[in-house]
């Protein structure tokens, strides 16, 4: 049984900024709240248009982009997801991540909006005749399971169309954007560490050092 003493976890103070952390924060590449909303809207609009036309590309792309934005998953983790990694039953709202950094199996908690989207996506896949059982890939195209490189190119395509792309600021910046936004919402480093599955809280502290004006005030919900 856990004692009161053992349950106390001491974290480094976010205010104790070292020169190295300040340099990391200054170089952190992420998209602000408005830019993320633009990306979401563009991908969602493309999905709705493709659905009306009986096409499938935009539907898959919107799912991938929404997943990355709403979870902070690494692109390789998103590409490796199996349908059975989605725990969407009653009382469950999480995604199992089997090969995160450090080769440790973990999970990310998801919000109701993403849970609903994933459920609809699985139902759509089934209607399209795609397998959604144990071990079946979540993202499956005409050439097989999507690769991390394929998802990177999808994100890059949308960013370029929105004039948001710049070298070094692409798909992984979505993970940083999630970390920045999540910390701005509740100022809870432990929550950010758990969601991003950082092995050390030191990796998470960088998000506490970002002081961009766009994230200086509390928000009611992520990307809503």
Question: Where are the language model's segments positioned?
Answer:
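Conserved catalytic core of the tyrosine transesterase superfamily
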Residues: 1-224
